[in-house]
Swiss-Prot record:
Belongs to the cytochrome c oxidase subunit 5C family. Its main location: mitochondrion. It is found in: Mitochondrion inner membrane. Keywords: Membrane, Mitochondrion, Mitochondrion inner membrane, Transmembrane, Transmembrane helix. This protein is one of the nuclear-coded polypeptide chains of cytochrome c oxidase, the terminal oxidase in mitochondrial electron transport. InterPro entries: COX5C. The chain crosses the membrane at residues 15-34. The keyword Mitochondrion applies. Disulfide bonds: none annotated. This is Cytochrome c oxidase subunit 5C-2. One of its GO terms (cellular component) is mitochondrial inner membrane.
Length: 64
């Protein structure tokens, strides 16, 4: 019975290269989403001020 050997998975430490690649990928994805959000907000603000300058909208409530 002492001759039976069971194959067990050996645990390895973290792979530095794999961790760097995963971190870089997640960072770039999050940064890209943040930039897209920022560009969208910037576009909305620019549109608002363009309409305000042309007189198509106003910031004061009109009296009826």
């Amino acid at each position: 019975m002492a001759g039976h050997k069971v194959a067990h998975a050996t645990l390895k430490g973290p792979s530095v290269v794999k961790e760097l690649i995963i971190g870089l990928t997640l960072g770039l994805a999050a940064g890209g989403l943040w930039k897209m959000h920022h560009w969208n907000e910037q576009r909305k603000t620019r549109t608002f001020y363009d309409l305000l300058e042309r007189g198509e909208i106003g910031v004061v409530a009109s009296e009826e």
